[in-house]
From Swiss-Prot:
Residues linked to a glycan: 92, 213, 237, 434, 443, 504, 610, 703
Membrane topology reported for the UniProt record: Lipid-anchor; GPI-anchor
InterPro entries listed in its UniProt record: Cell_Adh-Cytoskel_Orgn, ConA-like_dom_sf, FN3_dom, FN3_sf, Ig-like_dom, Ig-like_dom_sf, Ig-like_fold, Ig_I-set
Signal peptide (UniProt feature, chain positions): 1-25
Gene3D superfamilies: 2.60.120.200, Immunoglobulins
Disulfide-linked positions: 62-110, 159-216, 264-310, 359-417, 465-515, 561-611
Residue positions of covalent lipid attachment, annotated as GPI-anchor amidated aspartate: 924
Domain Ig-like: 27-127, 134-232, 242-328, 340-436, 442-533, 540-627
Protein name: MAM domain-containing glycosylphosphatidylinositol anchor protein 2
Record function comment: May be involved in cell-cell interactions.
GO cellular component: GABA-ergic synapse; glutamatergic synapse; plasma membrane; side of membrane
Length: 949
């Protein structure tokens, strides 16, 4: 019978890799973390939460399955905001954040997708724990008026510390611990509105013994090994809130370039207040010099102006604040305009009519601004015909007007207005305005051949509007056909000569542009306008810009190049070329595309085909790479236990892959396999012959042997067809000599339930277990002590009956085939933790099943009875001669208090340490070496057939 099973297993091995179908699979994902979470000893989480101390290193790994290999992306959300790691997602399996800060806590998502099905997404919440230094503030009601809330002499000490998790506060007076009710003169309470953020110590009607040293201790109960923090405050009869005085004027008006010093002194407060300077808007200038309460600004500028405040704080009462405003003198933006007689509908200046000249500047401070008027260099005073006024600052600040009533010929000349500040130190601004018979309003025209303007994309162009008149005003340019910004980003651009220069013209800049006169430095009349049309020509935009076409020989291919947009749209011509060889030319009629067919591909037809579509502005190009190269192989990363631990210093690796789109090109006849040790330069290569056609999704297997432990290797795989080499794929294989399962992931490390038993094992954690669980049995945490960690257990409550079995099957573990007549089989140390607590504990058995023996199970380990409320560890040496499987069998005892649990199952190469093994081969011991002679011929045959596909 054993021989029959052996032959069946051998047939299965021979078929593996030859007919492997269906390995394409959508992604699955799970998140694991390095290190132990520092958990709170409270069962308050029903979701995946990882806790870490601020300043430590967070390392999360996204473990994925699926074929082809899924692409991974990490993202993070916190509340409604999304944080993508400084606007760049993390695209590898491991997310590592060194020196993590509190704002980096939140929910982290791992997204895996490979184009099959929906993306797989898992998340984990990261809680960053921290405790800041506590701060004590004091508020007192001593001497308050009777209408206030508190009538007695009362002091409130408030302690606040930022923390996560919530902080617990305690108070001491000297060495005495203060508790609510321990002293009638002391009350300790939390305000309703603070939600545990603070704890207030109220000293009612101060007594002599209340003048003492008070200490506030903030604690998070040593979570994440965060120590308690303490702050002290001495309360005395001199304790008082701060008061200060500024030894400067308000406001302070200074000239640019001067140095200014602000002095702030304390006039009261116990303990001694600390002094800080702030600015009402923005930060303090970098050049300032601070010395206690003295602030010095050397070489002040207009940017340094503003309100500066001195704040005194000693945590008693409210901080004291005094402010002063610094004003830096400035004169800028001098301009003028001429207004003709408003009572006549005429924009010209005429003898006998009124004319007004206006000057405007921006002045700081505005109250120091003065204007002086001159005619031909001589001072001008206000008179009946020459009226000098200043406009209301609320209407037009910094503006002066000269009204010339009944203009005469003798009034022609140059008028000058001079703006100055009374405080001096600032250069005056002079504005000259000429009034004469040649002073006429402006006129705008567009020179011939300057509209429409035709240019090409990327060129530099100048738009011109010719302005006449005296004086010539500023010209404003804007878009006339749409509300979009000008090239400099503003809605209007100024020009003093009427020219608008645009560098690197783009097609979006085509359209109508408006030039118009400004009222400044000219006549205050209705603006003159003109329009200039800009036409930007650009070469055709085509698709596809590049397309790779893979086809085998003797097959047909048709390439198509389509025009998306172009200007001018007619006349368009096209050229098809293979390299430098001209294949076809033509002209577009009504169609928007051109095609080039290849009826039967041959070696000389492969190459890069270029289709150029041409207009006056240039050419757009479609490129087609026609090739017979095979697509890259797709390495299969989900091979379970691909490492064979065969001999002491070397190992073998089961390399598996599928071929992407195998039917796209000619049949793949072989693969070139390259392998090199990580960090080395030289590749060792060999060919793997392929017989027959490869099917889509077919899993191909090749065994790499004689790999040196524990080195990693780079493996390169290149498909070969009659065309030649295809695309290569490279991956790294690593030696992993140990299997470990803590049952934390969703698929419980590929353990499965036995269909032949009476009931199933259950994945459980203390935090998620049913609130109606049976007391006095089962673990209170997983093996590591975490209430959020998972384990597997059997629930023995009703309707379970005595003697019923639950069986849990491990995945199949592979070992390397070897000569059975050689040295002793490789040894493995099998270990696990078990929990057997309760007065009705039954039996826990472990069996070893070798591949091919579907009915024979060899007892490996057994234990029964109550072992106490603790996790115990078992170690067993096993010596399998072929692939094997482990079976955990839990048998229900006589009552409901009989829950059995297992956790942290490990299989490591080599024998267990002697101190870990049981002292005798009892019921709790290990079974001896397992050898099955009937498998020897099968193993030899497998060795001969390897490597295989």
């Amino acid at each position: 019978m054993d021989l029959v099973y052996g032959l069946v297993w051998l047939l299965t091995v021979l078929l593996e890799g030859i007919s492997g179908q269906g390995v394409y699979a959508p992604p699955t994902v799970r998140i694991v973390h390095s290190g132990l979470a520092c958990n709170i000893e409270e069962e308050r989480y029903s979701e995946r939460v990882y806790t870490i101390r601020e300043g430590e290193t967070l390392e999360l790994t996204c473990l994925v399955t699926g074929h082809p290999r899924p692409q991974i992306r990490w993202t993070k959300t916190a509340g409604s905001a999304s944080d993508r790691f400084q606007d760049s997602s993390v695209f590898n399996e491991t997310l590592r954040i060194t020196n993590i800060q509190r704002h980096q806590g939140g929910r982290y998502y791992c997204k895996a997708e490979n184009g099959l099905g929906s993306p797989a997404i898992k998340s984990i919440r990261v809680d960053v724990y921290y405790l800041d230094d506590p701060v004590v503030t004091v508020h007192q009601s001593i001497g308050e008026a009777k209408e206030q809330f508190y009538y007695e002499r009362t002091v409130f000490l408030r302690c606040v510390a930022n923390s996560n998790p919530p902080v617990r506060y305690s108070w001491r007076r000297g060495q005495e611990v203060l508790l609510q009710g321990s002293d009638k003169g002391v009350e300790i309470y939390e305000p309703f509105f603070t939600q545990g953020e603070t704890k207030i110590l109220k000293l009612k009607n101060l007594r002599p013994q209340d003048y003492a040293n008070y200490s506030c201790i903030a604690s998070v109960r040593n979570v994440c090994n965060i120590p308690d923090k303490m702050v002290s405050f001495r309360l005395s009869n001199k304790t008082a809130s701060p008061s200060i005085k500024l030894l400067v004027d308000d406001p302070i008006v200074v000239n640019p370039g001067e140095a200014i010093t602000l002095v702030c002194v304390t006039t009261g407060g116990e303990p001694t207040p600390s002094l800080t300077w702030v600015r009402s808007f923005g930060t303090l200038p970098e050049k300032i010099v601070l010395n206690g309460g003295t602030l010095t600004i050397p070489a002040i500028t207009s940017d340094d102006a503003g309100t500066y405040s001195c704040i005194a704080n000693n945590n008693v009462g409210n901080p004291a604040k005094k402010s002063t405003n610094i004003i830096v003198r400035a004169l800028k933006k001098g301009r003028f305009w001429i207004t003709p007689d408003p009572y006549h509908k005429d924009d010209n200046i005429q003898i006998g009519r009124e004319v007004k000249i206006s000057c405007q500047v921006e002045a700081v401070p505005s109250e120091e601004l003065t204007f002086s008027w001159f005619k031909n260099g001589r001072p001008l005073r206000s008179s009946e015909r020459m009226v000098i006024t200043q406009t209301d600052p609320d209407v037009s600040p910094g503006t002066t007007n000269l009204d010339i009533i009944d203009l005469k010929f003798t009034d022609f000349g140059t008028y000058t207005c001079v703006a100055s500040l009374k405080g001096g130190g600032i250069s005056d601004i002079s504005i000259d305005v000429n009034i004469s018979s040649s002073t006429v309003p402006p006129n705008l025209t567009v020179p011939q051949e300057k509209s429409p303007l035709v240019t090409r994309e990327g060129d530099t162009i100048e738009l011109q509007c010719q302005v006449t008149g005296k004086p010539k005003p500023i010209i404003l340019w804007s878009r006339a056909d749409k509300e979009v910004a000008m090239p400099d980003g503003t809605m209007q651009m100024e020009s003093y000569d009427g020219t608008l220069r645009i560098v690197n013209v783009s097609r979006e800049m085509s359209g109508m542009y408006r030039c118009q006169t400004s009222q400044y430095n000219g006549f205050n009349v209705k603006p003159r306008e003109a329009l200039v049309q800009l036409i930007v020509q650009y070469p055709p935009a085509v698709e596809p810009a590049f397309l790779e076409i893979r086809q085998g020989q003797d097959r047909s291919v048709t390439m198509s190049c389509r025009v998306l947009r172009a200007y001018p749209i007619r006349v368009l011509t096209y050229e098809w070329r293979l390299g430098n060889k001209l294949l076809r030319t033509g002209q577009f009629d009504s169609q928007e595309y051109t095609e080039y067919p290849l009826k039967s591909l041959s070696n000389e037809n492969y190459g890069v085909y270029n289709c150029s579509i041409i207009n006056e502005a240039g050419a757009g190009r479609c490129s087609f790479l026609v090739t017979g190269k095979a697509y890259a192989p797709e390495f299969y990363y989900d091979t379970y236990n691909p490492v064979w631990q065969n001999r002491h210093r070397v190992y073998s690796y089961s390399l598996q892959w599928t071929q992407m789109n195998p039917d796209a090109v000619d049949r793949i006849v072989a693969y070139r396999l390259g392998i090199r040790q990580a960090g080395q330069q030289r590749w060792w290569e060999q060919e793997i012959k392929i017989n027959g056609n490869i099917q889509k999704g077919e899993l191909i297997t090749y065994n790499l042997t004689e790999l040196i432990k524990p080195e990693a290797y780079e493996v390169r795989l290149t498909p070969l067809t009659k065309f030649g080499e295809g695309d290569s794929t490279i991956r790294v294989i690593k030696y992993t000599g140990e299997f470990h399962c803590g049952f934390e992931d969703g698929n419980i490390c590929l353990f499965t339930q036995d269909d032949t038993d009476n009931f199933d094992w259950t994945k459980q954690s203390t935090a998620t277990r049913n609130t109606k669980y049976t007391p006095n049995t089962g673990p209170s945490a997983d093996r590591s002590g975490s209430k959020e960690g998972f384990y597997m257990y059997i629930e023995t409550s009703r309707p379970r009956l005595e003697g019923e079995k639950a069986r849990l099957l491990s995945p199949v573990f592979s070992i390397a085939p070897k000569n059975p007549y050689g040295p002793t089989n490789s040894a493995y140390c099998f270990s696990f933790f078990y929990h057997m607590y309760g007065q009705h504990i039954g039996v826990l058995n472990v069996y070893l099943r070798l591949k091919g023996q579907t009915t024979i199970e060899n007892p490996l380990w057994s234990s029964s009875g109550n072992k106490g409320q603790r996790w115990n560890e078992a170690h067993v040496n096993i010596y399998p001669i072929t692939s094997f499987q482990l079976i955990f069998e839990g048998i229900r005892g006589p009552g409901i208090e009989g829950d059995i649990a297992i956790d942290d199952v490990s299989i490591a190469e080599g024998e267990c340490a002697k101190q870990d093994l049981p002292t005798k081969n009892s019921v709790d011991g290990a079974v001896g070496i397992l050898v099955h002679i009937w498998l020897f011929p099968v193993i030899i045959l497998i060795s001969i057939l390897s490597p295989r596909r």
